[in-house]
Amino acid sequence: MSDIPRTYPQGVPCWIDTEQPDPEAAARFYGELFGWEFSNAAPPGAPAYLIAALDGADAAAIAAGPEPARWNTYIAVDDADEAVRQTADAGGSVLAPPADAGPAGRTASVADPQGAEFRLWQAGRRPGAQAVNWPGAWNFSDIRATDTVAARDFYTRLFGWRYLDLGESVESMIAVPGYGDHLEATADPQIRERQAGAPEGFEDVVGAMEATAGGERAHWRVKISVADRAASMATAQRLGATVLATDDQVWALLADIRDPQGAEFTISEFREPA
């Protein structure tokens, strides 16, 4: 990896945080589960915003929020105000208008036409996650849609996404054209060498789109890498979380987890295909 900070072009998911009724309890849970260390980035007198660091690199954050707790995914945009207008024009909903997050950046809360909520992030001093794709760090955020065809149309219109159908256990992989070139030129110069056996275009992949099942609502799902799914499941349960489901995929062993305050996320152990 390069020493150049990781930056995120328009349309690339760039950050995750979780809103929790008891942020300090959440910090204890996630700190033990993933090895995160926390510092408060909020100015004096403001509600705490706990930045989680992994090996000194920004990985995620915890903020105060109502029950049930939830995870949020932020997607990078060049202009948050314009992206909000485009979201509404494409049939989405604006849940909170653009607002400055101090010098860190500018953000807004929106939802797609199926109700899946996500955040927009126009970077200032904080471009997004610096710890990604290693154990304890964010891997991907996936969209689970009630109508994948309509969801494809919405996100393509908003962000210019393309989709790679791999014929495996996911509906399609989300790709941002040119993202691999951006990574190769900045924070990840070995990306193509490292992904030599991956499907064509995989260097542009930023997430996956799946169909919901069993009456599940449309939502964005945060996926965090772990070295050992079984060990991480056991730790999560010991700390009061619930394992909702497991899924053995070609490239990963997954488990859906509900944390002690109700926020759901997925852990992912990478494995080489047999």
Q: What do these predicted ranges mean?
A:
Residues 1-40, 51-95, 111-245, 256-274:
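Glyoxalase I/VOC metalloenzyme domain signal
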Residues 100:
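Ferredoxin-like iron-sulfur electron-transfer modules
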